[in-house]
Amino acid sequence: MNTVRVAFLLVFVLAVSLGQADKDENRMEMQEKTEQGKSYLDFAENLLLQKLEELEAKLLEEDSEESRNSRQKRCIGEGVPCDENDSRCCSGLVCLKPTLHGIWYKSHYCYKK
């Protein structure tokens, strides 16, 4: 029975000592993997950032072109003098001669349709 105890004790000691070595080795492997993972994540993050910046630049460029081409010119509001030939009244307004002609300085004003 002593030989069984000695054999069991020997196996136990070997298992504990080898287990500790594996634990340290595993810890070192995990540290290496996390360091590699961090560098990979940094690379992926930089790549994603570049793509987002390119996309943002493209969108801003489209917006500026769109606003430049479709920008409404300044218009004249209701009750403001306008030129009969070059009517810049806002939408929904028309350049008309007022009914009481002698009161106003100009002869045409923007009125609602």
Swiss-Prot record:
It comes from the Eukaryota. Disulfide bonds join C75-C90, C82-C95, C89-C110. It is found in: Secreted. Expressed by the venom gland. One of its GO terms (cellular component) is extracellular region. InterPro entries: Toxin_22 (IPR012627). Its main location: secreted. Residues 61-85 are annotated as: Disordered. Residues 1-21 form the signal peptide. Residues 22-74 form a propeptide. GO terms for molecular function: sodium channel inhibitor activity; toxin activity. Keywords: Disulfide bond, Ion channel impairing toxin, Knottin, Secreted, Signal, Toxin. Belongs to the neurotoxin 14 (magi-1) family. 01 (HNTX-16) subfamily. Probable ion channel inhibitor. The presence of a 'disulfide through disulfide knot' structurally defines this protein as a knottin. This is U11-theraphotoxin-Hhn1x.
